[in-house]
């Protein structure tokens, strides 16, 4: 049986743990946007058939999640020993005589008898129920002082192995996708996208990194402190980048993005990697006036004064199959919209978040509110009546009928089209309108109104809601 440890001699189930440096090896990470990290380490440590015990450097280890992907190896126990603090060193020094450095370089020696309650024996044989004042000096012994966390792992191998393959789930590293779209007047946009990794726990040196996009349930809170993981998480040798952009694959109900080349990042130092080459996409712009009805609940009477309504600006990027942008699934993230001014400088004109978008599905985002397109809505009529003879099993049946006038003003020199939408859960309908409504779904209808440049347009409609 082979053993290696930095802690000294240990006995466990008849296995001797002999002193040696912790084993290192290749590291790869799968980073999830919620902060979880799957850490995989292939360690240059041979396993003999049967029981093996080793000391490993496993940064951010949650022992409960440790396992071996090798079908011939099982983890039978794992003990995480954090970096040594002063109290732990004092406990390990019980029975030892330590030197305590006091003010102006003075020293005093005392034997540690107990830490809680504190008891020390002085050189004259007297016992003191406290520690001597000053800072204790400890011998630099591996069995006494650990400068970083280490894990003592017991493995059962059904056959000898040349390396040790381990994996576990940690936390403290997140990633987000941010996209930039430079929109032009011709209806075409140039789109780029990148992933930014932020670490509050791991310092990674030359590791293979994958980013995972998808909705993964979380049922368990990691118990060990993230601070214990603030050490190097990888020792793989540097290699030339495989490609300039991430490659993508489907695993279960997630999409996994392999970043090119070995990746290194430090705590608190964000790293950005491109997700795909620059792509061109056609787009359309929409102006949308949201409806007056609540999604659920009572449609109330409004003031007779006109009510200013924000006009939302939406962009839809076409992502047909067979196009460079359409064949690529997009991890959910933030889309930043830019447009060039008269001098050719790009200006930020909108920003929106969106969810994971599969290949072939158009991307629709709301960039903000219009500046030169405005809307006012006024309630011109309102009636509420009780409907006799309600259906069996229902209480009082109320019908609300309300009429509205929406005035659209376009300060742009060119003509535009504005959507006025209404959506509501339940039994409702449009009984009269100055423009034909279009039914988008069982709960939403819209009016499409052309508005001339530097001009106005008016819509009137009546809604009937039964509740």
Which residues are covered by each model-predicted region?
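Long, intrinsically disordered, low-complexity accessory segments associated with secretion
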Residues: 3-5, 11-467
């Amino acid at each position: 049986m082979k053993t290696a440890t930095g802690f000294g001699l240990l006995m466990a189930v008849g296995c001797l743990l002999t002193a040696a440096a912790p084993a290192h090896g290749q590291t790869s990470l799968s980073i999830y946007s919620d902060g979880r990290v799957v850490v995989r380490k292939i360690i240059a440590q041979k396993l003999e058939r049967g029981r093996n015990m080793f000391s490993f450097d496993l940064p951010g280890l949650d022992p409960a999640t440790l396992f071996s992907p090798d079908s011939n190896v099982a983890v039978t126990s794992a003990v995480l020993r954090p970096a040594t603090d002063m109290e732990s060193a004092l406990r390990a020094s019980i029975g030892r005589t330590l030197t305590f450095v006091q003010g102006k370089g003075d020293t005093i020696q005392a034997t540690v008898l107990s830490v809680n309650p504190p008891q020390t024996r002085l050189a004259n044989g007297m016992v003191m129920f406290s520690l001597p004042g000053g800072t204790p000096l400890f011998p630099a012994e591996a069995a006494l002082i650990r400068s970083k966390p280490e894990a003592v792992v017991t493995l059962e191998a059904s056959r000898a192995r040349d390396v040790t393959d381990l994996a576990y789930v940690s936390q403290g590293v997140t990633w987000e996708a941010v996209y930039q779209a430079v929109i032009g007047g011709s209806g075409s946009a140039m789109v780029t996208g990148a992933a930014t990794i932020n670490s509050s726990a791991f310092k990674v040196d030359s590791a293979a990194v994958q980013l995972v996009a998808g909705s993964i349930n979380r049922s368990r809170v990691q118990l060990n402190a993230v601070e214990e993981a603030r050490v190097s998480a990888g020792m793989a040798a540097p290699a030339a980048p495989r490609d300039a952009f991430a490659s993508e694959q489907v695993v279960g109900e997630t999409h996994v993005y392999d970043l090119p080349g070995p990746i290194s990042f430090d705590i608190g130092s964000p790293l950005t990697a491109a997700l795909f080459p620059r792509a061109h996409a056609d787009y359309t712009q929409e102006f949308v006036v949201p409806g007056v009805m609540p999604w659920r609940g009572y449609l109330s009477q409004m003031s007779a004064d006109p009510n200013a309504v924000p006009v939302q600006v939406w962009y839809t990027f076409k992502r047909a199959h067979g196009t460079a942008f359409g064949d690529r699934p997009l991890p959910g993230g933030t889309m930043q919209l830019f447009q060039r001014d008269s001098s050719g400088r790009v200006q930020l004109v909108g920003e929106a978040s969106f969810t994971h978008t599969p290949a072939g599905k158009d991307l629709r985002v709301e960039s903000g509110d219009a500046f030169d397109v405005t809307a006012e809505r006024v309630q011109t009529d309102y009636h509420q009546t009780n409907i006799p003879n309600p259906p069996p099993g229902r209480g009082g049946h109320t019908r609300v009928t309300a009429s509205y006038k929406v005035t659209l003003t376009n300060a742009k020199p060119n003509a535009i089209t504005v959507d006025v939408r209404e959506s509501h859960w339940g039994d409702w309908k449009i009984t009269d309108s100055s423009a034909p409504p279009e039914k988008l779904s069982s709960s939403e209808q819209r009016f499409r109104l052309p508005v001339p440049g530097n001009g106005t347009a008016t819509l009137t409609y009546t809604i009937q809601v039964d509740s």
